[in-house]
Amino acid sequence: GIGFDVAAFLVAAPSDGQPRALGEWLAEWGVDLDNSQPGGLREPAPTRPARQVWLLQRKPGAPGAQLGKTSGWVHRAHLRHNAVRMLGGVEYLKIDERGLLIRVDGEERWLEVDNVVICAGQEPLRELQISQAAESLRFHLIGGARVAGELDAKRAIREG
């Protein structure tokens, strides 16, 4: 979901717009192209994330459990690899100069954070659809724009 995308952006090192060197990526993930190690894998050499990130969700359960069947594991692995701390079943209580006060499993706890990014819900906004229909323009309304909620890429592809 959007929280995973934002967390991945936040842990990324600043970029000059150039693709990352292949050797760096291979070392980070422990890929041995020389096949000098069994299975072509060596000990990963993770890079240091640009910042410490918490990924919190109100829904009970592990964050990312509802990510896509074919690629969700990659997103979860990437955030774990970058030491993103993930909690589900979180109740948000307060944001102030001390950070973010949350409650998890009945226990309150302060997270010392400098910034809070809220990635919460969406509501369909169909005013443009109505005006385009009035002008007899052809359009397609698919995915999260058609039905707000959990994004389902397969559904969006089928729809348009």
Question: Language-model features: where?
Answer:
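A conserved FAD-binding loop/helix module that cradles the flavin
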Residues: 2-8, 46, 64-72, 139-160
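Ferredoxin-type iron-sulfur electron-transfer modules and their immediate structural context
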Residues: 122, 130-131, 154
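A short, gly/pro- and small-residue-rich
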Residues: 9, 13-17, 130-143
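A Rossmann-like FAD-binding core segment of flavoenzymes
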Residues: 6-127
